[in-house]
């Protein structure tokens, strides 16, 4: 896919298999500081009921890529009324049991697309990511928790 981690490559792929608390020995930065320093965050979720990490990325002006197998990806598609694109701040890729390589290729292409995006447009993409995060604030979601709570109570008391 062209991501080879050569010295001259503009994109470096790294795996950090630890929790980022600021003393990991690799970055030594707290999670949120590192998150804000990223140009793009990739979350190739195979299954996540919601997925807070893509939302956190958006809240810190970091556009992200996720899949429609995450609740967050499904929610973004619903809010936007179409499959999320890089320009929207959240790229949502279709994922199923048989398209692993296609998902990997689309994620790679999204990274390349962002690298080739002019600075002014990248700023707009970052702002769109924040706009999506703002739509997921508690002031918008709390009513659903109250509805679920009241539904649960009604089931208990109607038995």
Feature map (PLM): residue ranges:
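Nucleotide-activated donor-binding/catalytic signature segment of Leloir-type glycosyltransferases, i.e.
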Residues: 1-33, 92
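Helix N-cap and loop-to-helix transition residues
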Residues: 27-30, 99, 118, 137
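A structural signal for well-ordered alpha-helical segments within the folded catalytic domains
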Residues: 29, 36, 105-109, 139-143
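Acidic donor-binding loop of glycosyltransferase active sites
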Residues: 32-49
């Amino acid at each position: 896919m062209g991501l080879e981690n050569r010295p001259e490559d503009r994109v470096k792929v790294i795996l950090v298999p630890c929790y980022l608390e600021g003393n990991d020995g690799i970055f030594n930065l707290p999670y949120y500081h590192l998150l804000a320093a990223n140009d793009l965050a990739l979350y190739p979720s195979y299954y996540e009921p919601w997925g807070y990490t893509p939302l956190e990325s958006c809240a810190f002006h970091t556009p992200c890529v996720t899949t429609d197998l995450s609740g967050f990806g499904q929610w973004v598609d619903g809010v936007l009324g179409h499959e999320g694109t890089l320009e929207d701040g959240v790229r949502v890729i279709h994922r199923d049991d048989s398209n692993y390589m296609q998902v990997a290729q689309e994620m790679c292409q999204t990274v390349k697309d962002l690298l080739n995006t002019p600075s002014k447009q990248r700023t707009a993409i970052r702002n769109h990511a924040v706009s999506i995060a703002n739509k997921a604030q508690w002031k918008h979601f709390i009513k659903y928790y109250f509805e679920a709570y009241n539904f649960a109570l009604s089931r208990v008391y109607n038995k």
